[in-house]
Structure formats: C-alpha cells, structure tokens
C-alpha cells in the first residue's frame, strides 16, 4: 500500500499570505493530511479503508449457538415429540420460511413462547436446528429418511438438496424403486427424474430385485411404458411383467390386461409370441389379453398392413446407455496362479488386457459393488489368501486398502446383496468352510452372519428376489447338488430344491429371473450340462449343454446375454467363451480370451466413460506373451 497523500506546507511573504487568505481549504494542511494539492488543484479525497470480516458470520453463529446451548436470550421453545428445543425466533425465521411465516404473521404461535411441532422426527428437528446455528450437517443412511421430510416441512431448501444428492449417490438396482417412491412422496422432482432414469437404464437388474416384485400396479405401468427402457428385447419386459404378476397371482391377475397393454407384443419374435405369451394360462384366460395377442399376431403376419397398424405398442424402445463389459480376473494357467486381468467388450467382441492385480489369485471370488470390482481371497500358488483388492475401471488401478476377510478363503463364492459384499464358504487350507461374512464398504469392515447348514468349497452364489443362494460345491468329500438360500432379514439359511446334478466349481448367474447353473465337476468328470432354477416354483429344469465341458467356469450376464468363460475340460485349460440364446436354447462359441483360465473370477461393469488403458498397449510385452 502507498503512503497517504499530503501537502508541502506554506511558504513566506506574499505568496504564503495569499494562500492563507485566498485558499482556506489548504490552511493548516501541514504534516500528515488526508487531502491536499501538489502543484495542480484537485478536489479533496477523504481517506478510507473498507473491511468485510470473513470471520464475523462464523463467530457470530458460534456465539449465538453458545447462547442457545446455555439457554440464554432464547425466546421460543419447540416441543417436538418428547423433546424441548430452545432457540431464538430471529435465527429460525432467517433460516426457514416456515418459521418466518409462523413468527412474523398473525398466527397464534407468533405470541407463544412454547410451540408444538407435529409430524416431524425429533432427532431430525434437532439436526436441522443445529444446522441453522452452525451451517453444518451430516446426512447419512440412518437419518436421511427422516431429515428429508423434515427439511421439506421447514422449507430448508439447501438441506432438501443435500438429502437428494445423498440419495442419488446411493442409487443401485436393489433400491432405486424405493428411492423413486420416496422422492415422489416428498415432491423431489430432480431426484424423481434421476431415479426414473436409473431404473430405465438398469432395468435388466432392477427387474430381478425384490422391490420390483412389490411395486404397485401404477408404478409398474409407469416404468414399462417408457420408450427409454433399456432392454435387449421385448421378451425381457414380458418376463418381468409375468414375474411381478405371479408374485401375487390372486390379487394381481385382475391387472394383467392393464399391464400387458404396455408390453410391445408386436415387437416379440413369432416363436416367443405364440409359444410363450399365447400359451400362458393367465393370458389365455383373459379376453382383453387374448385381443392383445391377436393384435400382435396380425402385425407379424400381415407386413403389408403394418403402416396402418402403427401405435405405441409397435414403436421400438430407444434406450440410451453405455454398454457393459466383462472382466476375467486371475485364475490358474499353465500350472500356476496368475494375476492378469482382461476385459471383454461384446460390442467389439474384443478382449483387452487391463492392469493386473498385485497378487496372483486362483479360486478368487469376484463381484461388483458401487461400480468397483472386488477380488476376494484365492490362492497364490503357495498360500491361502484373505487379502482383497479393488479395481476402479475409470482409473485402471487396483487398490489394496480393503479390510481382509476374517478367514483365508479360496474357491469362495462372492456376491452383493443390499449394498453388502458377501463371502460364502470356500476352504482355508485346513478345512472346507461353512462360514459366511459380509463387508460394509462404508465401514471398511467384515462381520460374520449365520453360517450355511453345509460346508461348501467351489460353491456358486447368486442373488435373486432379496435372497442369497449358495449352490452346489463340495463338502470336502464329494460334490453337492444341494442348494440353500440366506434371508438377511432373518439372518437364516433355508434349504431349497436341489439341482439334478452334483456340481462343484460350477458357474452360476441370474438371467431373466432364473438362476442358471452350468458346468462344474461331479464325482467322475468335468461337465458341460446346464440347468436353471425357478424361484416361483422352487424347481430346477435342464437346458441344453454347453459346447465344451467346463469346470472352474465363470458365468455372467453382459448386456442381456449369458456368457460362459474359460474353465477346464478335463485335459486342457480353456480360453474360449460361449454365449447362450434362451430363445433357441443353444450355446455358440464367440471368441477367446488372451489367457487360458481355470478358477478365475468374472464381473460385469458399465464400460468406462474414458479409455484409461495406457497400460494395456504394452501389457502383453511386459508380462510376456500369454500361453497359447
């Protein structure tokens, strides 16, 4: 900062006298002055220093909060539930339009020193009043469902926005419908829009959730009538509708025609329309449904008439989405465990190497949680592992900061249910395990849940309808065909119908509301056979066998198609993959991985928004050429 301007003072003789008498504004302007002239006369400029305190608002709020805590100068008490909350009207009115209207208008509460607030959670109110005094709040899973309604009532828009942002970040296929309903109830339009988009984008996973089966008919119609619904074919929409219907046939069959009119039956294949839709007993027993089927048949049989038959049911859906990609992780190749990881893109039918794990892992359990790929346990060729690595496809990096499981586990089953990562069975080098534990990513902590009724290594796991299924495996003596499922609400395992074939080291996945179990090994040999489980009838039924025998096979659904990856055929490790077509009940080969893999894990994720795979270009050279 420069010096303050000053003047040079007076002289002597006539000039000085003239200044004294003729320019009174400069009289006495000697030493430090605030205005003056030097040579050329200028209008005086008063000195100023403007200051705005950045600390003042925080300090003032802190002091006001201290007064509140000590109940000093408080002029209102809020009775909420069984709790009394002391406060200052002016602070509440400044922060909340609700309180401003209450205390500055003609309402009776404006004259009361104690005000009762109804229909609001007392803990949520305490947090919101704290926010008014501190500008700080923590929104978390345990309080968001009470905070958001309270913030809406008090018209605290900033807190509403924070709660909605928190819920957006929590969206996944198992909870998006509940969050959507919550947003609709509280008129959170942006959250409702995001939840709708998420539901449409992830419909193939959403339709397998328990929330979907519990939908009211109106919400189901809202979802399936969307042009943006992301499905591989209209068959998936029909299957989803029938699963919903059969969840409670007695109450829902009256709505079948109302719902079926939003399934675009003319877009079905003729075989599916006649063989599946037209032959369904519930459809055949409803006249309006039969009319819809006849309309679709006419559309398919009379192509020359189609221009005259256009309507909402003949309009193809227009989903916009990033495709899914499949990751093959670790495994056993040429006599040793491997750390390599590669990615398959069905749109290009290409396999690319990505960053390897830090440890070699065979018998590794793999699952995707919150858009991150977890590799759990396994065997590195010398030791049984309890360590875990986590892969981020956006950065193409593995991290090792995940808490280890409580037990070493190889040949372990891993799956995600209700936001938790479950590790099921396996072996620890001493015994076959029935232990089950689950990982909370928020706490970075594993905790044990109820053990299975049977010890299982080489077990396959799947999640369907809010249950965790443990399928087959070996008890340490012989392969199993038994199946049990875990209910997290009761923390209990219950047996369900067994498979028709004993299988250990099998692959399994949920596809079109069935659990598919393929390959594995029985008492004598590696298997190519496959079967699927219907949870509505609690029955297993066979499907066509794969083209190759595959033990230690990975099975996954990618972009609505079922892929079997790698394995061992009894004489050679495999790098081939094959895909299943449920309409034709056939498997076909569709390419090869870079590495042969037995006992590798597979996981499916959205394709990264950016191709951050600089490592890939030289990965094969750095790790030598993969075995042929």
From Swiss-Prot:
Chain's role: Probable substrate-specific adapter of an E3 ubiquitin-protein ligase complex which mediates the ubiquitination and subsequent proteasomal degradation of target proteins. May have a role in synapse differentiation and growth.
The protein's annotated pathway: Protein modification; protein ubiquitination
Organism whose genome encodes this protein: Drosophila persimilis (Fruit fly)
Disordered, as annotated region: 1-56
PANTHER family: KELCH PROTEIN, KELCH-LIKE PROTEIN 20
GO molecular function: actin binding; ubiquitin-like ligase-substrate adaptor activity
Protein name: Kelch-like protein diablo
Location of the BACK domain: 176-278
PROSITE patterns listed in its UniProt record: BTB
GO cellular component assignments: Cul3-RING ubiquitin ligase complex
Lineage, highest ranks first: Eukaryota, Metazoa, Ecdysozoa, Arthropoda, Hexapoda
Keywords: Actin-binding, Kelch repeat, Repeat, Ubl conjugation pathway
The Kelch repeat ranges on this chain: 325-371, 373-419, 420-466, 468-513, 515-560, 561-607
BTB domain residues: 74-141
SMART domains cross-referenced by the UniProt entry: BACK, BTB, Kelch
Domain of life of the source: Eukaryota
An example Gene Ontology biological process: proteasome-mediated ubiquitin-dependent protein catabolic process
Feature: compositional bias, Low complexity: 14-29
């Amino acid at each position: 900062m420069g010096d303050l301007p000053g003047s040079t003072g007076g002289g002597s003789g006539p000039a000085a006298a003239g200044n004294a008498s003729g320019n009174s504004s400069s009289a006495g302007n000697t030493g430090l002055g605030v205005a003056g002239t030097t040579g050329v006369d200028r209008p005086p400029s008063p000195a100023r220093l403007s200051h705005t305190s950045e600390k003042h608002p925080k300090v003032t709020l802190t002091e006001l909060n201290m007064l509140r805590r000590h109940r000093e100068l408080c002029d209102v008490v809020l009775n909420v539930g069984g709790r009394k909350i002391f406060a200052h009207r002016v602070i509440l009115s400044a922060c909340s339009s609700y309180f401003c209207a209450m205390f500055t208008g003609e309402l009776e509460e404006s004259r009361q020193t104690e005000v009762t607030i109804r229909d609001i959670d007392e803990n949520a109110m305490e947090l919101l009043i704290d926010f008014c005094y501190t500008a700080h709040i923590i929104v978390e899973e345990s309080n968001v469902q009470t905070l958001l309604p309270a913030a809406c009532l008090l018209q605290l828009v900033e807190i509403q926005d924070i709660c909605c942002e928190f819920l957006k970040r929590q969206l996944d296929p198992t909870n998006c419908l509940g969050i959507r309903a919550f947003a609709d109830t509280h008129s959170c339009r942006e959250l409702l829009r995001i939840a709708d988009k998420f539901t449409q984008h992830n419909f193939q996973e959403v339709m397998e959730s328990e929330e979907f089966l519990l939908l009211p008919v109106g919400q189901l119609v809202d979802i399936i009538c969307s042009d943006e619904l992301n499905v591989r074919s209209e068959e998936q929409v029909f299957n989803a509708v029938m699963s919903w219907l059969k969840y409670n046939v007695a109450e829902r069959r009256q709505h079948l025609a109302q719902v079926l009119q939003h399934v675009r039956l003319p877009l079905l294949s003729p075989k599916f329309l006649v063989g599946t839709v037209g032959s369904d007993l519930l459809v055949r027993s409803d006249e309006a449904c039969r009319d819809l089927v006849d309309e679709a048949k006419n559309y398919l049989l009379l192509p020359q008439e189609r221009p005259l038959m256009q309507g909402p049911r003949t309009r193809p859906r227009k989903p916009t989405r990033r495709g899914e990609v499949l990751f093959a992780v670790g495994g056993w190749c040429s006599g040793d465990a491997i750390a390599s990881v590669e990615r398959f893109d069905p749109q290009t039918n290409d396999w690319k190497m990505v960053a390897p794990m830090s440890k070699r892992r065979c018998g590794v359990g793999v699952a995707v949680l919150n858009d991150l790929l977890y590799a759990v346990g396994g065997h590195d060729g010398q030791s049984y592992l309890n360590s875990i690595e986590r892969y981020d496809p956006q950065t193409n990096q593995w991290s090792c900061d995940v808490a280890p499981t409580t037990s070493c586990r190889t040949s372990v089953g891993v799956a995600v249910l209700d936001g938790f990562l479950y590790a099921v069975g396996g072996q620890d080098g001493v015994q076959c395990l029935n232990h089950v534990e689950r990982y909370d990513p928020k706490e970075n902590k594993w905790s044990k849940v109820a053990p299975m009724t049977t010890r299982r290594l080489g077990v396959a796991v799947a999640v369907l309808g809010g249950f965790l299924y443990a399928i087959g495996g070996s008890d340490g003596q012989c392969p199993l065909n038994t199946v049990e499922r875990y209910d997290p609400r009761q923390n209990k395992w219950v047996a369900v119908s067994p498979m028709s074939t004993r299988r250990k080291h099998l692959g399994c996945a949920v596809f079109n509301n069935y659990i598919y179990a393929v390959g594995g090994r029985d008492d004598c040999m590696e298997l190519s056979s496959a079967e699927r489980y219907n949870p509505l009838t609690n029955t297993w039924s066979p499907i066509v066998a794969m083209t190759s025998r595959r033990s230690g096979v990975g099975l996954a659904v990618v972009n609505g198609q079922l892929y079997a990856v790698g394995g061992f055929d009894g004489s050679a490790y495999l790098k081939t993959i094959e895909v299943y077509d449920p309409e034709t009940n056939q498997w076909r080969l569709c390419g090869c991985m870079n590495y042969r893999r037995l006992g590798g894990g597979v996981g499916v994720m959205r394709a990264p928004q950016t191709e951050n795979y600089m490592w890939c270009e030289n990965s094969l050279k750095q790790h030598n050429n993969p075995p042929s």
